[in-house]
């Protein structure tokens, strides 16, 4: 078997920390801490009781998650072993595929579930522990964070008890919070830790929220073109970020003026929508943060006496970047210093905002203003409202609790009436523009991780329309199925082989034996194998399906432990080794090659400590899985022998002595002695099966059912053949010419005709229905074979015999061309084997059926 290249695993050394405590009742030593050292690395991990750990499992990418409850050393065997007792968590991929719909939503990528199932094995090998993991419990109303890069942070919100998902109880929620708080205290620091992990100032929820914000701010800054920021935007963003003193120190160096002028703090953020940046003179309302005098004093903005004497409305207009009226004299000089070329500070000529300067620059900016304001103001405000609606949807999607407050601060002037906005727009002259400069990419990258910015609304994902992306599915019925129009049509539906009957008659004992075998394995949490044999059509597969259906109902009623059912059929496989692929895909949903799937299944059923439920595997048509090495049969029968497998195999084949006839000794020994043979149905059993199918339906005469049952029981005892004959009899009865007063029941004549069609050869039927000239040509072939003593003759010899037979019977003999056409037609029906017609008279002719069958078909009735 070819092996795939696997990842090189580092060797780890496990040792106890501290003195042991002797448990006199269980006679082993317990510990409170364990040290894990990795070969070739100077770091070490200290694991204590109560922490959450990762444990080796079947999938290296998704190891098992558990809470460490106890550490002890088992010295019952000569080499002492390090053992641990844990409380398991389960991932969504570990939940059975048939029960994943019970969650009712899409699970988070890093969401796990508390495994509330006491019957699982919680005693594991302590040397299978990989490392520590952080588990954060969430309340039922909390949203599981998504798209987090920290793989060692998991979230638990619900519990899973093999039947349904439940929210965490208050006691369990408090218990999960306790070790989370003490984990940082009891865990010793490791050199490889980063500064962010060591800082105790952030709570887990705030840490996750900051990472989400930094990612969205980074994506937004890459998509947004660089534009100079207006004083209004600077003041507003500056006031919005007063709570972060570190941010103020970083951004205060970005805009420096001369010593005589005022220093201003600038915080760059892409809060405004693209439509607002393209139209800087748009009317805006003052945010609540700008109206607070306390926050205004913290920003370091100083006003002159004229500004203090001015009314609040004028001060609002000054801060919100709306042009001042001509009667106000603004004498204070303010320096606008956009960052350019990677420099952290730059000095530019100051611009004095006075009415005279505004008048001079008004003419220069008129053309640019007309181009920028080509869209009506009312339409621009509607587009900004749409943008804000998209931002609100994105904030709800991220689950940010502060979204409502931030929306109020950046809400545009949507509540102002149309008339008042038009009047203000007509009375306010445009303010001067700044030439755009390139903002430093390095500075922007340093700031984008700490600023909270709003992200663009992701586009709706379109459904794939190309055939290569479309998922294959069975066509759905556009119209409802029509109900049977007659009694015979209803009988045909009930007699179909695939129709599921209400009961399974004549197999009560076999049903009980198989049910008891599987039920005992489920209750004992062990594995086993049963070999079921019998001729085709004796109800082997139907009986097993009925057993599984009853066990599934019992599992739902808590009578037996839950299990997973898998069925494979050797008839549906293109190659015997594909059985590994089918089992792995139905068990875990993974897709792999045959060799890789065999390795994964062997690891699944032979690894200790894996918290899995019992698997019932039905292998139908087992004889088709035979190979020269018989490795497939050996693996299927060897896996249930392992204690940790919890695998029950039900193998079905048509041969009773298959293990002794074709299996090796090592394979037949793994199969065991639990075998069951299904005997062919007798006449009375077949008659009972037919009557149970036609219950409360009068479509057959009693003698017609008895005739079919006796005929089939004498030949094979196949129930499927019996059902097919009865269905054909209903078709013959329906299409036969009957009198108007006939009862319309299937009689003995109809059943006899159906039996003859079923058991007679198709070649004989074709010869009986052939023309007189074709039957005469077949007689000529038999006469020539009898004359020459060979079973092959040329067309010329057969034509001579054909002419002689026609003269003896007084019939006009056909021409050579007509006889050649008859020979070609019989050859196309595969009654004859003929050479190509280019040989003409010398082409050789043979019979494709026996001479006795031809004589039987040509005899006079």
UniProtKB/Swiss-Prot annotation:
Mg(2+) binds at residues 620-621. GO terms for biological process: DNA replication initiation; mitotic DNA replication checkpoint signaling. GO terms for molecular function: ATP binding; ATP hydrolysis activity; chromatin binding; DNA binding; DNA replication origin binding; metal ion binding. Residues 501-861 are annotated as: Necessary and sufficient for ORC complex assembly. Phosphorylated during mitosis. InterPro entries: AAA+_ATPase, AAA_lid_10, ATPase_AAA_core, BAH_dom, BAH_sf, Cdc6_C, ORC1/CDC6, P-loop_NTPase. Residues 207-216 have a biased composition (Basic and acidic residues). Belongs to the ORC1 family. This is Origin recognition complex subunit 1.
């Amino acid at each position: 078997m070819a092996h795939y290249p696997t990842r090189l695993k580092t060797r780890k050394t496990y040792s106890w920390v501290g003195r042991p405590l002797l448990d006199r009742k269980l006679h082993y030593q317990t510990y409170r801490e364990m040290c894990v050292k990795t070969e070739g690395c100077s770091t070490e991990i200290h694991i204590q009781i109560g922490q959450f750990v990762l444990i080796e499992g079947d999938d290296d990418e998704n190891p098992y998650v558990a809470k460490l409850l106890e550490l002890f050393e088992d010295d019952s065997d000569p080499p002492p072993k390090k053992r641990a007792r844990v409380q398991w968590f389960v991932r969504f991929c570990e939940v059975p595929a048939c029960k994943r719909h019970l969650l009712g939503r899409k699970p988070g990528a890093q969401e796990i579930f508390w495994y509330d199932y006491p019957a699982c094995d919680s005693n594991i090998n302590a040397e299978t522990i990989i490392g520590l993991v952080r588990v954060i419990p969430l309340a039922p109303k909390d949203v599981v964070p998504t798209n987090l890069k920290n793989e060692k942070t998991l979230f638990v919100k619900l519990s899973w008890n093999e039947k349904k998902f439940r929210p965490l109880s208050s006691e369990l929620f408090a218990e999960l919070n306790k070790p989370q708080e003490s984990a940082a205290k009891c865990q010793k620091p490791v050199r490889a830790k980063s500064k962010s992990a060591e800082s105790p100032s952030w709570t887990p929820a705030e840490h996750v929220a900051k990472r989400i914000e930094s990612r969205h701010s980074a994506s937004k800054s890459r998509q947004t073109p660089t534009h100079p920021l207006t004083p209004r935007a600077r003041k507003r963003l500056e006031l919005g970020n007063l709570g972060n003193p570190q941010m103020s120190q970083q951004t205060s160096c970005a805009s420096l003026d001369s010593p005589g002028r005022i220093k201003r703090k600038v915080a760059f953020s892409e809060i405004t929508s693209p439509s607002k940046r393209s139209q800087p003179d748009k009317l805006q309302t003052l945010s609540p943060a700008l109206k607070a005098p306390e926050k205004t004093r913290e920003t370091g903005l100083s006003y002159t006496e004229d500004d203090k004497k001015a009314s609040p409305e004028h001060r609002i207009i000054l801060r919100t970047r709306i042009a001042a009226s001509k009667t106000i004299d603004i004498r204070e000089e303010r320096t606008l210093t956009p960052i350019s070329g990677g420099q952290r500070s730059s000095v530019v000529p100051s611009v004095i905002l006075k009415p005279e300067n505004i008048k001079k620059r008004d003419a220069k900016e008129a053309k640019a203003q007309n181009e920028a304001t080509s869209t009506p103001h009312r339409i621009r405000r509607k587009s900004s409202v749409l943008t804000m609606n998209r931002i609100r949807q994105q904030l709800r999607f991220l689950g940010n609790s502060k979204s409502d407050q931030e929306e109020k601060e950046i809400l545009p002037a949507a509540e102002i009436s149309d008339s008042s906005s038009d009047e203000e727009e007509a009375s306010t002259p445009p303010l001067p523009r700044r030439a755009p400069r390139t903002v430093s990419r390095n500075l922007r990258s340093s700031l984008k991780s700490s600023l909270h910015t709003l992200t663009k609304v992701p586009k709706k994902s379109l459904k794939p329309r190309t055939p290569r992306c479309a998922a294959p599915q069975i066509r759905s019925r556009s119209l409802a199925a029509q109900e049977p129009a007659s009694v015979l049509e209803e009988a045909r539906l009930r007699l179909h082989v695939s129709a599921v009957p209400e009961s399974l008659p004549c197999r009560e004992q076999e049903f009980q034996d198989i049910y008891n075998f599987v039920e005992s394995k489920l209750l004992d949490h062990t594995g086993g194998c049963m070999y079921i044999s019998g001729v085709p059509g004796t109800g082997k597969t139907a009986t097993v399906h009925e057993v599984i259906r009853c066990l599934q109902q019992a599992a739902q009623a808590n009578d037996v432990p839950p299990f997973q059912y898998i069925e494979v059929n050797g008839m549906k496989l293109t190659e015997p080794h594909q059985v590994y692929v089918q089992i792995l895909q139905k068990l875990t949903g993974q897709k792999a090659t045959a060799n890789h799937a065999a390795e994964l299944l062997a690891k699944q059923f032979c690894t200790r400590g894996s918290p899995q439920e019992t698997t019932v595997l039905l292998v139908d048509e087992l004889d088709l899985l035979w190979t020269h090495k018989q490795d497939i049969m050996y693996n299927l029968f060897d896996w249930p022998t392992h204690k940790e497998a919890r695998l029950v195999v039900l193998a079905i084949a048509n041969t009773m002595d298959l293990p002794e006839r074709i299996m090796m000794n090592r394979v037949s020994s793994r199969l065991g002695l639990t075998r069951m043979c299904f005997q062919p149905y007798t006449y009375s059993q077949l008659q009972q099966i037919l009557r149970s199918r036609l219950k409360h339906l009068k479509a057959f005469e009693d003698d017609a059912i008895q005739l079919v049952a006796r005929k089939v029981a004498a030949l094979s005892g196949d129930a499927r053949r019996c059902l097919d004959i009865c269905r054909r009899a209903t078709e013959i009865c329906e299409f036969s010419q009957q009198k108007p007063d006939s009862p319309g029941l299937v009689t003995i004549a109809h059943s006899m005709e159906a039996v003859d069609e079923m058991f007679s050869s198709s070649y004989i039927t074709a010869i009986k229905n052939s023309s007189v000239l074709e039957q005469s040509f077949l007689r000529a072939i038999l006469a020539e074979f009898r004359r020459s003593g060979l079973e092959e003759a040329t067309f010329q010899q057969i034509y001579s015999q054909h002419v002689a037979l026609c003269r003896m019977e007084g019939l006009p003999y056909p021409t050579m061309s007509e006889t050649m056409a008859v020979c070609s037609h019989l050859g196309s029906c595969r009654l004859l084997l003929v050479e190509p017609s280019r040989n003409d008279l010398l082409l050789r002719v043979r019979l494709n059926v026996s001479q006795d069958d031809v004589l039987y078909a040509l005899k006079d009735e």
